[in-house]
Amino acid sequence: MKQFRFIDLFAGIGGFRLGLEAVGGICVGSAEIDQQAIKVYRQNWPTDRSEHNLGDITTLQQLPAHDLVVGGVPCQPWSIAGKNQAFDDPRGQLWADVIRLVRINQPKAFIFENVKGLIDPRNRLCLESILDSFKAEGYNVYYKLLNSFDYGVAQNRDRVFIIGIQQKLGVPDFSFPEYSESEQRLYDILDNLQTPSIIPESLPIQRNLFGERIEVGFNKLTPRGAFNDFFILNDIRNGPTSIHSWEIYATTEREKQICTTIMRNRGNPRYGDCDGNPMSYQDIADLVVDLAESELQVLIQKRILRQYEDGKYEFFNRRLSGGIDGTYRIFLPHARFFGRLTARGMHDEIAEISVSGATAEAYKQNFIQQILIPKRHRPITVNEAARIQGFPATFKFHSNQSANFRLIGNSVAPPVIMALGKALPNDHLFEPELCEV
């Protein structure tokens, strides 16, 4: 395996570095300004010289001698759920600095990572501008949306990767790495989970002619005909693995009927333009026979409903991702992946045991009785989050736990970077005599 030198821009805690060092890369400089990230980075690479951190990329010009430049460019402006400010946001302007550094230093190749929002149709002009800028500097450019799950990471995490290779090198076209399915389960990588004797039947992942995974069912990583291996706690959606507050709290059959009726009808356009709308007492009374308003007041006392100033009723837990009592999804130990780790934190937890069932309803009731009611579920730890992201168990963090979760959520998954590093045509890119350090 040939060695090559690389610059780690927006280094974070070193996800790119871990992946590239595993395939012969030698980091000759990193750039990061987040002090908490720098502290974690230094803990894990303590022998780096002080000048190894190049600092703020907006002030950089000439970089240390290198072959490859990599980095996860700050991505918030491209969020599909955000305001799509893109280049109008100062963080979006960092792309201009990346392009400038490529122009000045002319690396043989580069790898840049971003959120999937970058390839959203609303951001098409911005993406084309980035690609055209790199092409104008003499690079063949390739991009693709990759999911970490396809490269052995226990996480459903989509990211866009942009690869550039100098045209004048005349190397073969770049091909993104083949998928590498993993048989691991969460009980293989998380702590103190019970290995189930029976795992609910799953079918093989289905792929199209291009090898891309076919999205099926309620969750794209759950095979058709199989049970989800997680449960969603929410009051605004229904499904075989959805758990509602009225199924958890003490409620009568009549109260369950009222809640289910509201859930099924709140999206009706007659009540408003939103996906789910508050409903008046009369709206609900038209659907529930002999409804007394006092019945709705009891559901308010049980923190299932709330009432607005205009008198309309809505579920207390009205946000899907907010879950119930702060928990959104609970993954079972036999699950093949955990929820997507984010810098803003998450409301997902892990169950201590797995359950099964002959039918969807039996599966759901076994979960409620054996896991939910006895509270046999918990948040994941920092070290578990790191392993879910593909970091080694030996990776070191500092004492600020909330900062650690943020840093992990911001990081790239090292196994994906390792796969991309292996896919580079290094026999043509990296000559031995140019790799002395």
UniProtKB/Swiss-Prot annotation:
SUPFAM superfamilies: S-adenosyl-L-methionine-dependent methyltransferases. One of its GO terms (biological process) is methylation. It comes from the Bacteria. GO terms for molecular function: DNA (cytosine-5-)-methyltransferase activity; DNA binding. Pfam families: DNA_methylase. Disulfide bonds: none annotated. Keywords: DNA-binding, Methyltransferase, Restriction system, S-adenosyl-L-methionine, Transferase. Belongs to the class I-like SAM-binding methyltransferase superfamily. C5-methyltransferase family. This is Type II methyltransferase M.HgiCII. It comes from Herpetosiphon aurantiacus (Herpetosiphon giganteus). The gene is hgiCIIM.
